[in-house]
Amino acid sequence: MIVFISLFTLFLTLLSILTNNVIVWWSIFLLMTVVFILLNKSSKSYTSIFNYFVIQESLGLLFLLCSGGLLQFFIILLKIGVAPLHFWIFNVTNNIFNYGLMWFLTFQKLPFLTILLQIFWLSSVYILLFGLLICYVQIFVMKSYKNLLIISSTESFNWIVLGVFFSMFNTFYLFIYYFVLMVLLISKFSKTSGYNFINWETTLVFLNIPFSVSFFVKIFSLSEIFKYDSFFTLFLLFTMFLSVLAFSFWLINLSMKNNEETSNNNKMNYFIIFPLMVISII
């Protein structure tokens, strides 16, 4: 089923690129909501399904009513959950686990991203950069492991959105690679796994260590954004220090405790991840 849904999502993404009809776009929004419901129905995440359905369909109707103009652009940003319009995400992710969470943070956003590209407003770069600043402040005050990962994923997706307007090919390549990484990391967020996701691999990846996927997302985006506004982007780089302090919360727990039962991981998967990080430079 997951293979069929993945292929169906790729088909909807291709369809959204080939057409600029608002009715077709709205139909894609509706079908992606159905996909989300199908994926999370088996885990009985009814609260998250209800919240997601109400939010997405309300915004979908507004998208139809407000045909043309900047309002449609902001509605798409809100539907995707791009910072600083990501405040509703936690109402959905609280009861989502395992691959449902992975799908929500990655592939679920792919058709929306291609539609956003077609109605992009150039001055929104400043809004996206401000959203990154909000993410860094939120990461600094977060104390939940799961919320830390969700905010970090939202922040990385903001960099992807910024990058797609400058280099679409590089961004889609990084998005697919980011998706593969999240498949291996977020699969630990299950109801029965406890804190298995608290490990050195997860922490180091989200600390933006060199050759990690989030590191490349930021480097490729920064190389283009510096041409647009160097001062504000440089200021953002200094504020990234807040995220390092926040993820040190993980580092302290990992250093002070020897949780052998919570350090189990798919070790072979990580032997695959890190060589791929180096290959992605090429």
UniProtKB/Swiss-Prot annotation:
Organism domain of life: Eukaryota
The protein here is known as: NADH-ubiquinone oxidoreductase chain 2
**Transmembrane residue ranges:** 17-37, 58-78, 87-107, 115-135, 166-186, 202-222, 232-252
Tell me the protein family, please.
Belongs to the complex I subunit 2 family.
This enzyme catalyses:
a ubiquinone + NADH + 5 H(+)(in) = a ubiquinol + NAD(+) + 4 H(+)(out)
Which keywords label this protein?
Electron transport, Membrane, Mitochondrion, Mitochondrion inner membrane, NAD, Respiratory chain, Translocase, Transmembrane, Transmembrane helix, Transport, Ubiquinone
Gene encoding the protein: nduo-2
Give the E.C. number(s): 7.1.1.2
Task: Look at the named UniProt entry and state the broad enzyme category this protein falls under.
Answer: translocase
- Topology class, membrane: Multi-pass membrane protein
Q: Which residues form a coiled coil?
A: none
Which GO BP terms, alphabetically? mitochondrial electron transport, NADH to ubiquinone
Q: Which Gene Ontology cellular component terms are annotated?
A: mitochondrial inner membrane; respiratory chain complex I
Give this protein's Gene Ontology molecular function annotations. Answer: NADH dehydrogenase (ubiquinone) activity
Query: Tell me, what does this protein do in biology?
Result: Core subunit of the mitochondrial membrane respiratory chain NADH dehydrogenase (Complex I) that is believed to belong to the minimal assembly required for catalysis. Complex I functions in the transfer of electrons from NADH to the respiratory chain. The immediate electron acceptor for the enzyme is believed to be ubiquinone.
Subcellular localization? Mitochondrion inner membrane
